[in-house]
Amino acid sequence: MGVMEKIKEIEAEMARTQKNKATNYHLGTLKAKLARLRNELFVEQSGGSGSGGGEGFDVARNGDARIALIGFPSVGKSTLLGALTATESEAAAYEFTTLTCIPGVMQYKGSKVQVLDLPGIIEGAAHGAGRGKEVIAVARNADAILIVLDAGKEGLNRHREILERELETVGIRLNQRPPDVTVTKRKLGGGVRFSSTVPQTKLGPDPEKVVMQILREYKLISADVLAREEITVDQLVDVVLGNREYKPALYLYNKIDTITIEEVNQLARQPHSIVGSVNKKWNIGEPLEDDVLKQKMWEYLGLTRIYTKRKGSPPDLEERE
């Protein structure tokens, strides 16, 4: 049985299993196995590393930060790149216009932010559909991700869920921070010792048993585990694997000129979201103009401006962009 078949079998068993205190241990074991198999599959399909870019995707890092544009085909990523950086990326009324990674540089508040226009990804990208592997590999190396969605498309929420799932499958965690958990391997044996500074209600009635089983799944039979916050099985698995990328992500609902004001208001209330229209210049201005989108991108990148002065000279208090 291949890795994909094993993954589907575990997913089917998880779907059949009711979630309660009695099944918590079993579900934890299944989640650990599923994460291990997905990791094996990703490494296998990525040629052993999971970080290669592929032809047309190896772009030298430039500027103070890097942000990747992720989305389905024909949602306006190429036009958006031009609005942010004055870089021309071919745009057309048909899908899959962009076939490689197109870089541009956005200048904002004295900083240079590299913006990468990536080809549209489709469902199954994490397992190699389209050029999904290359696109997601670039996203893993970005400092932040801008997910672009077409506000006028049917199934908008499903599109968002698909993109989130594809990124999560390859170990990208959006708008999360690494859990405060430490796993220390021991050489002298002694089994798994689990301690926590807070109650672990999400690990079921016997957290230590669940932790031991998860570590055993990854052949860790002698280790100390210390949790300083309440965690889930998925978070513990992420810590054990140690190859997760935690990225700030902003969702841009583009083309709001094609929907009603009520729908715009509803989208604007979504977490980590901004609404706009590249064509109408709503919340998205010219490359050197300040606008709502650039302000949000700056905020999510977490950049800090540092002012210096020459030794012995008075400080220059004049504000410059």
Listing of model-derived features with the role each one plays in the protein:
Residues R16, A22-A65, I70, V75, ...:
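C-terminal-of-GTPase-core extension/linker across diverse P-loop GTPases
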